[in-house]
């Protein structure tokens, strides 16, 4: 695992504890994680994959199973979460980086064919807009972004509680994603009979003038 320095933050302190119970508890409310991978596999067969907010590595394991030949990079701010991820993914084609995602990962080269955010962007407060911009810069022309995340809730008390847990639930992600990428999938789903909604988005980066999509 490679590491770069990351500043201390409330989010890091939050996951210092939650890393120990994350895999045992998140199945009950982080819906759509397998579906977004399944839907992404319909539109791309990526050679280079980036997951932002890879956490304990659950999606990294699924990505490796679906795309066995791909080079995979996982980025997260939490050292305890990355330590768990490192125990799950031990192949030479997977790299883990500890860093904030406020700027692109790659400095030069081909870029990534797929960037995945799984219940990450709604916790980047502030920073979600910069993360979307960084993902756009990290993607190769014609590359795809896949996002599954909380959307919104009509219940103010629930929104406030999620805010205590660093989650912003205002439906703010989807318009920006649809503006920045060509939408291939853009859906909202109810959870627990409408207590909240979550969203699934897959979009494609358009080639700039003079660039070609292979």
Model-inferred region functions:
Residues 129-141:
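A short glycine-rich, Lys/Arg-flanked "PGG" loop and its adjoining helix->strand segment in the class I
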Residues 50-52, 56-103:
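Class I SAM-dependent methyltransferase SAM/SAH-binding core
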Residues 182, 188-214:
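Core SAM-dependent methyltransferase catalytic element
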């Amino acid at each position: 695992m490679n590491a770069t320095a990351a500043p201390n933050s409330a989010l890091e302190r939050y996951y210092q504890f939650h890393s120990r119970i994350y895999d045992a508890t998140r199945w009950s409310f982080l819906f759509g994680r397998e579906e977004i991978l399944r839907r992404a596999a319909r539109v791309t067969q990526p050679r280079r994959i980036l997951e932002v907010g890879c956490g304990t590595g659950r999606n990294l394991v699924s990505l490796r199973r679906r795309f066995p030949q791909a080079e995979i990079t996982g980025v997260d701010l939490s050292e305890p979460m990355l330590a768990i991820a490192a125990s799950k993914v031990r192949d030479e084609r997977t790299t883990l980086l500890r860093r904030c995602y406020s700027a692109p990962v790659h400095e030069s080269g081909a870029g990534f064919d797929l960037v995945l955010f799984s219940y990450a962007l709604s916790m980047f407060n502030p920073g979600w807009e910069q993360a979307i911009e960084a993902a756009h810069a990290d993607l190769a022309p014609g590359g795809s972004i896949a996002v599954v995340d909380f959307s919104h809730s009509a219940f103010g008390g629930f929104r406030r509680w999620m805010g205590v847990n660093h989650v912003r639930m205002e439906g703010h992600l989807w318009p920006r994603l649809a503006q920045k990428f060509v939408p291939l999938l853009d859906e909202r789903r109810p959870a627990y009979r409408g207590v909240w909604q979550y969203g699934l988005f897959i979009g494609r980066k358009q080639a700039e003038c003079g660039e070609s999509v292979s």
